[in-house]
């Protein structure tokens, strides 16, 4: 099993780099340069290629092997990072990202989205049912580690690490990962698709996807389970910045510290699943804990507006805020690992020729749910105010707890 998990870990790690770059590093840098919460939030529209994965998932199902797709897409990611290295960084006083930088970041997301389809195809085909728990733990932990390194890690180093050196470092990482994708023995053993296995070209593809047992419920769950968490997670660090926290502090708190807790949560989730915990039972417990944690974070936000409240070093509020960030990420990590295990189990119920497309369909809905609130959180905060906005997030976080009562028996 280690021969399968090690290359998966390396490839999922580099897959998390663009997400960390755009979810942690760029928003804080842009907010520190004076952009509104709305403008900062709307930069997440650069994730749009991830929502179009179904456009090329059937092609990955029918043409070539995961190793070929992984190698080519990862090489292209290194090339885009090399081009970003020669461009100047965003400057103070700019109203947004330069058009050229936005275009290259869009290409970066396109390459990462193609890589994601190929990598998920490999995982669905490579892992046995008993390996789903450890496999999804590796997937989530490695992805979050890559996100933390590209987000919080680079944010801490950014005052001393130049923009060109940052992207040259990322380019070298991608090219090493491309070599891993090509050389890993486990990836070369997967067979080329046979003609009889091809996904049919028909207008009934969506009908075929929804006909897979458990798909309707899983699709609804993954679309909603992160709405409240993602909205709060996107907005809370920016509000802390407005209350006096520095960008380097937030790099440590919401980048490295909180993501470390998220990785710990994902690891715990994987360990519990490996000990034969049912994913849906685990979700029921942890979703309730996550809801309570978000309620505490909302109370902290209200207290921050009271006279004398501060997140200065040595204050109780600073410790409470840090604990709040860590708890949300920890519970979110457990929830993510269990949810991805449910998704992969559901996709394995599909015919082999449809598995990559089916998993991409679920993963696209999962990402859409996260992007929806991550992108609109700033707009909601500017229009409703942060307090009412967090009340909405609490209601949204309660929805998946209720949704679990409708889960089909074939996913338990």
Curated annotation (Swiss-Prot):
Q: What induces it?
A: After 24 hours of starvation, up-regulated in the brainstem and cerebellum and down-regulated in the hypothalamus. Following 8 weeks of high-fat diet, down-regulated in the brainstem.
Which terms in the Gene Ontology molecular function aspect does this entry carry?
A: transmembrane transporter activity
Compartments it resides in? Membrane
Concerning Gene3D superfamilies, the annotation shows:
MFS general substrate transporter like domains
Q: Name one GO cellular component term.
A: membrane
- Where, by tissue, is this protein expressed? In brain, expressed in the cortex, striatum, hippocampus, hypothalamus, thalamus and cerebellum (at protein level). Widely expressed with highest levels in kidney and liver.
Family, similarity comment? Belongs to the major facilitator superfamily.
What is the protein name given in its UniProt record? Major facilitator superfamily domain-containing protein 3
- What organism does the UniProt record list as the source? Mus musculus (Mouse)
